[in-house]
Curated annotation (Swiss-Prot):
Record-given protein name: Ribosomal RNA small subunit methyltransferase G
Annotated source species: Rhizobium rhizogenes (strain K84 / ATCC BAA-868) (Agrobacterium radiobacter)
The keyword Methyltransferase appears for this protein: yes
Matches recorded under SUPFAM superfamilies: S-adenosyl-L-methionine-dependent methyltransferases (SSF53335)
Location of the protein in the cell: Cytoplasm
Alphabetical UniProt keywords: Cytoplasm, Methyltransferase, rRNA processing, S-adenosyl-L-methionine, Transferase
Upper taxonomic lineage: Bacteria, Pseudomonadati, Pseudomonadota, Alphaproteobacteria, Hyphomicrobiales
Gene Ontology annotations for the cellular component aspect, listed alphabetically: cytosol
Enzyme class, broadest EC rank: transferase
Entries under InterPro entries matching the protein: rRNA_ssu_MeTfrase_G, SAM-dependent_MTases_sf
Keyword rRNA processing: yes
Catalytic reaction equation(s): guanosine(527) in 16S rRNA + S-adenosyl-L-methionine = N(7)-methylguanosine(527) in 16S rRNA + S-adenosyl-L-homocysteine
Gene name tied to this protein: rsmG
UniProt: S-adenosyl-L-methionine binding residues: G66, F71, I119, E120, R135
EC number: 2.1.1.170
GO function term, MF aspect, one: rRNA (guanine-N7-)-methyltransferase activity
Amino acid sequence: MELNGVRVSRETQGRLQHFAELFQKWAKTINLVAPSTVDDLWRRHIADSAQIFQLHPKPARWVDLGSGGGFPGIITAILLAEQKDGHVDLVESNQKKAAFLRVCLRECEARGAVHAVRIEEAPKIVADCDVISARALAELDMLLDYAAPWVERNENLRLLLHKGRDYEREVHKARGRWEFDLVKHNSVVESDSVILELTRPRRRI
């Protein structure tokens, strides 16, 4: 099986398929994503989320903010399962969604933990991380504010963030309070979407 042109193992394919089955089951009772996108689950959500890991396919400690229906956090955890190291901390304050995420981690044999707390509380629980991801959560300046406690602890922190067609406005706004190095990756799934890769984030003085 190939995912965005990258071959994945039979074991990973099985885990992704099982996740898709769990998602379809839970989505009948919990609003995990926009209902209009459920029928396009593999392309719109699974393949789209996989791009994040494929940009940084190394063992790392990930924090996924506002994990919701598992995108990209659960997909990252499943793709990490083939490696010896690496872990995903998924932050989701909604208790029902957090329960869904825990079931997915357990049944898909993916390395991770779910923290059913507000994002502002997460740095007290998860001390360190190498990469922060988020998808359809908040504007860039707010995401940087959320990431600030981890930025202070790790100057090499990397952020990988899904953004839509309005990303340039968000970048301009965020640069009013933050400095950062930026690489824009065009989405291979959605023509009007990008993934922003931020490194060396620091507050403006």
